[in-house]
A protein has these predicted regions:
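Aromatic-capped interface at the extracytoplasmic side
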Residues: 24-41
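Hydrophobic membrane-insertion alpha-helices, especially the h-region
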Residues: 11-29
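Soluble "head" domains of membrane/secretory-pathway proteins
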Residues: 3-10, 43-220
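Classical N-terminal secretory signal peptides
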Residues: 2-4, 21-22
Length: 220
């Protein structure tokens, strides 16, 4: 009887450890959920929504939504990232003990990839115009993207002209490994207009699916 009890306890502990290991590895390398807390990506991603990110996909195309590393340069240890993913998964994104921050630059964020390495770009009235390296003419971001999306652009008072991020940018050319990312809310969000081009190593994974709220399920 005692031997059977020990065997049952050992089996249970092995099952718990195996489940923990599987979930941790899955959330670290295959698919992990993120909680979208702001409206910077509406209508693409809903504020308060939860989406899946695939860390295996790190070769962006125009129009892709990508999860980017925090802009303050801080990186959590691998163990802390695994533990954070595990806790977030089982608390439905309500608790994230190792990634919470009060600073906008102190946590990972989602932005849309608009321009690729080698592109020449300029912005007019919050819309980016792009000339790929092999082309001779500029086209709008919407004409070049294979993925349809909408952006929030609304008129602002004249006294706001010098406040926040500009809706106009002079021509520039992206270098190798540089990407230009923008928020869908072009008036009230920080993005490459403020930070400059994003290096490829900042991509943590591509956003694949918003699965919550259930009334707004979207694939990207």
């Amino acid at each position: 009887m005692q031997r059977r009890r020990k065997r049952r306890i050992t089996t249970t502990l092995a099952l718990i450890f195996g489940t923990f290991l599987f979930v941790t590895l899955f959330l670290s390398f295959i698919l992990f959920p993120i909680h979208v807390k702001s409206d910077t990506m509406e209508d693409g991603l809903s504020a308060g929504g939860i989406a899946f990110v695939c860390p295996l996909l790190k070769k962006p195309e125009r129009g892709d939504l990508y999860y980017l590393s925090r802009m303050d340069g801080h990186r959590e240890s691998y163990l802390m990232m695994c533990a954070d993913s595990f806790i977030r998964f089982f608390t439905f994104q309500q608790i994230s003990p190792f990634s919470e921050s009060s600073k906008s630059s102190g946590q990972p964020f989602v932005r849309r990839v608009i321009a690729l390495p080698g592109d020449s770009i300029y912005m007019k009235d919050f819309v980016l115009y792009i000339k790929p390296a092999a082309d001779k003419h500029y086209l709008s971001e919407f004409e070049l993207s294979s993925k349809p999306y909408n952006v929030q652009i609304f008129s602002i008072p004249a006294e706001w002209d010098n406040v926040g991020v500009s809706g106009d940018l002079e021509e520039q050319t992206l270098k190798e490994g540089e990407y230009f990312v923008l928020a869908d809310n072009r008036v009230e969000s920080l993005d490459s207009r403020h930070w400059g081009a994003i290096k490829s190593e900042r991509f943590l994974g591509r956003v694949l699916l918003q699965y919550f709220p259930f009334t707004s399920i979207k694939a990207y």
